[in-house]
Amino acid sequence: MLLKKKRYMFDERDDNNINSPVAVEPSSNNNKMADTREVRIEEQLKVKIGEAKNLSSRNAANTSCSTQGTRDVYCTIALDQEEICRTPTIERTLTPFFGEEHQFKIPRRFRYLTIYLWDRDMKQDKPIGKIAIKREELHMYNHKDHWFSLRPVDQDSEVQGMVNVEVAFTEAQQTQSLSEGIDLGQHTLRHHQNLPHHSHQQRAHLNDYKENSELSNIQRASAAAASSSSAAMTLKTRAAGLFGHVHHPPSQTQHFPIINTTSTSSDQLSNWKSHGRFVGVTIKVPACVDLAKKQGTCDPFVVCTAHYSNKHQVTRRTKQRKKTVDPEFDEAMYFDLHIDADAGSTNTTGSNKSAGSLESSANKGYSIYPVGGADLVEIVVSVWHDAHGAMSDKVFLGEVRLPMLNKQEQQAVNPSAWYYLQPRSMTHSSRSLNATPRSCATPPGTRLSVDSTIGSLRLNLNYTADHVFPLATYDDLMNLLLESVDQRPITVSAVSILGELVSGKTEVAQPLVRLFTHTERIAPIIKALADHEISHLTDPTTIFRGNTLVSKMMDEAMRLSGLHYLHQTLRPVLSQIVAEKKPCEIDPSKIKDRSAVDTNLHNLQDYVERVFEAITKSADRCPKVLCQIFHDLRECAGEHFPSNREVRYSVVSGFIFLRFFAPAILGPKLFDLTTERLDAQTSRTLTLISKTIQSLGNLVSSRSSQQTCKEEFTVELYKKFCTEQHVDAVKHFLEVISTPSHASSSVHPAAAAATPLEPVLLKEGLMTKYPTSRKRFGRQFKQRHFRLTTHSLSYAKSKGKQPICDIPLQEIASVEQLKDKSFKMQNCFKIVHNDRSLIVQTTNCVEEREWFDLLHKICLMNSIRMQYFHPSAFVSGFYSCCGRSDENSPGCKKVLDKTMDYFQMDLVTALDPALDLQRIHTLIMSNMSVLESLLDPLTYHQSLSQTQHQQHNPLVPLATDLQKHSPQAFAEFKRTIEKLREKAYAIDRDHRDYKQGITRQLKYGSRQAPIGDDNYWHMMRAAGQLNQQHHQQQQHQQQQQQQQQQQLQQFQPQPVLPQMQNVRAYPYQPATSNMNAYCLHNMQYQQQRLPFHQQQQQHHQQLQQQQSQFQPLRSHQLQRHNNNLNNNNCGNGSSSSPSSTTSSVVAAPPSTTSSSQPAPPIY
């Protein structure tokens, strides 16, 4: 389909993600780009925390006692410094093993992924160390385990956020006093030069507020002394100038040059204009964004410090802002670019020197102060938190350094720009603004990876960031994938090719399952893939035992469509097991008291019986789409193995028990079955239950009900459950779930479980509520335990208590995000129901995103959904957004009308086909070289001749098999690959144009590309590399075409010699002594009788006559001869030259028959 192209650009939006690009109308030029309204960035992160090693003990004061004592250790995962999740505490160890896996979507912009390692203490938990990895570097560690060195956590390293700094330079006032000063003399000029200085100094004092306690009494006294001495020197200089001479001590020289009275006035005026144009600079910090919190709060203020070349410092600060991480300041702070030399003797940093020592140090002969005064070197803009009641009255939040040493640096400063806050410099000599801080992420194998005195932590990361275009952009690719359902054989389809192309089957299975579930064709595609896989098996016990594409797609389909069925079945019984914490260990080697084995066995049998009963009685609640898939698998297995009746059960139990129920019992947190932290005893209990349930599922595949036990201590356990009664219950369960209903054809497969018999728990957790409708005294923010089910939203004082409030889902009218300035708190949203509102705050941004998405989908389904709302809270008798005093007044902002055409809005699944298609496109582009190698004949022949290439190209065995058995299927296989390449390159062009458009419109120093990080330069470099890669791809394709032509020319016959024009080649026969047997038609006697020149004329005429007649025949004959030479490995290997052709040719018998025709070439 034809798509209208538009240009994309960055635009700041109301939500937290300021890096969200949106499309705007194209400009006057007709540049075509990918379609339409919006391009969104979907980021997802999976973190596996393994183990830590080489941790120092808590009481380790030196190396000798470093092995004494242990720690209680746990980890937290944070985006910048906002904690997202944490691991359980591993007690009394220095080598903790966590084995935790956390996966979540990233809802906002961040700079660093930070993993903290904590030591739990009675008083306060203390950080042992941390790992900070830049967002741009996360992809370097995907899918592999890496050891990272822990870095110390201090106040200077805990920096985050941005600051907006405005810089304005003040020019010297050039009035009529300038010419008067030139005529009257040197003293008058200096008098007028000192006037701006004192006026600006007076303005600077106005910005010094009462709460500015940085200057001590000594500093104030020294500053006053410097001011009075400067005034005295002005009078002294004026008086001396009247008598014709001026004496300048070294410490009192002026910073402006002395104008010679003997020169002309025009020269003096030009020197004045070219020298010292700027006399001061004004710094203003309008806003800061996303500052770090200290002890859960932030009361920021800004301090500006001017550093001069004589080590003099001038400090200004703003007023404090209360309880906000996004403060705004309106103060302007003024600093002189040049100060007098005597001012350099006063140090405002709090030195304890006396006045005499300062004067003596200023009059030393080896002073390094500049002649004429001191220049401004740099201005440090730092942000601080006012911690009242703490040991330190202020906490460092970050700083920005602005160089001001010379005119070049002053002109390089952006008048208004955003800066990333940087850690505090370790030494005062570090004055470089562009100096990047040392990264805390340490790749393995480097010198820094072993240079760690704190310890190391093993992590496995998987970070994905997809730029998702509107669904219309992927229409061609989606249609190509959907055609796979009807293609036969299935191996020539796009889905099968992707399964063989990508090594990680889970990466390609997940988007494929979600895409085909959205189009209601998941059952047919799994049936086609399963039928092809089962047809190539000879042993029924190995069905779906490997990690093939169809096995992974079945795993994803069960988890996608059957997740809430799993919650209904196992959540109640698992909650009891976690809460009761009964010991169930039956291994004698792991129990100190052997008499407790019988009691533990009884507890374990009771738990297994509960779980088994919950599973077998849940067959009626199995989703219809899963019933249809199980039915198709059973029919395919019965068709290929008709003599084996057990295979009809084992093919279903292999998925539902071995790949669904057993893994969910073993790891309930991975399937969202519980949010509790499991201790070692509970984990061991769940492991034993999972093994038993898996063994019960295997009973239907064996001909006897007694199964061999792998461990001796499980004999008594299996005796109770390996009975005919349990086997019949399992078979009945499998029969029911593999029998589809007749009404399933009219019901959406993904929405089959949307009407459960009892409420399904969607989400629960702790949140802070603020009821705006009630008028009460005291604290209104209260922490409550919220539960969201398919029926209602409720909250109670704690988990398990009676709900205080229960809101039916039908009564929820609107859910919208709030501005952070309403309560000066983050992660808040408003729930409106029955003309009342409830404001809720979550613990972090990820929780806010999950709760908001679920409630927003419910509101989209409600008929009473509101159209307008108030984006702010009703505080102090009015709405801060619109100023209305009536609490029941209609909203002032329209509810976001998000078109969810390509989203399936139900409570079971929320599918996003555009995101899934983008992930598939990313997989295709990452493996494009493998696809193109199959379309290149030269590379394909090399991969066939060398076995090493088959390991790098997984499609070569499939292509060889298709070429051998079915040339038509092989041709269809090539056409599918060409279509995949064509569709992928079309989408890639849209991505390239989009990124180039962003790069052209992005400004360095804006809020989207702040100064102080290399993100902008990475983007610029990436945009340049996109063009370069595009040109390289075109050049590579041209080179491949040239190589193909050269290769084909080598295979084509060489120009035939004049003596060989009528030579016909015949294949080798065993009866013939000469392999190169040619037949020459009556040419020898004519060449012997005719003169040489007549032979040439006659030969030339014959060539012209026979060229059009024998050219096709000659080409066919010579090609068949070359093929025969390749098929026959014996012979003389002799060649005929033009002079010896007549003597080397031997006539072949005309009755010779040709050999079997070889296989046709690929191209």
Swiss-Prot record:
In third instar larvae eye imaginal disk, expressed in cells posterior to the morphogenetic furrow, in all photoreceptor and cone cell precursors as well as in still uncommitted cells. It holds the Pfam family C2. Keywords: GTPase activation, Metal-binding, Repeat, Zinc, Zinc-finger. Gene3D superfamilies: C2 domain, GTPase Activation - p120gap, domain 1, Pleckstrin-homology domain (PH domain)/Phosphotyrosine-binding domain (PTB). InterPro entries: C2_dom (IPR000008), C2_domain_sf (IPR035892), PH-like_dom_sf (IPR011993), PH_domain (IPR001849), Ras_GTPase (IPR039360), RasGAP_CS (IPR023152), RasGAP_dom (IPR001936), Rho_GTPase_activation_prot (IPR008936). Residues 762-860 form the PH domain. Residues 26-148, 261-419 form the C2 domain. This is GTPase-activating protein. It comes from Drosophila melanogaster (Fruit fly). The gene is RasGAP1.
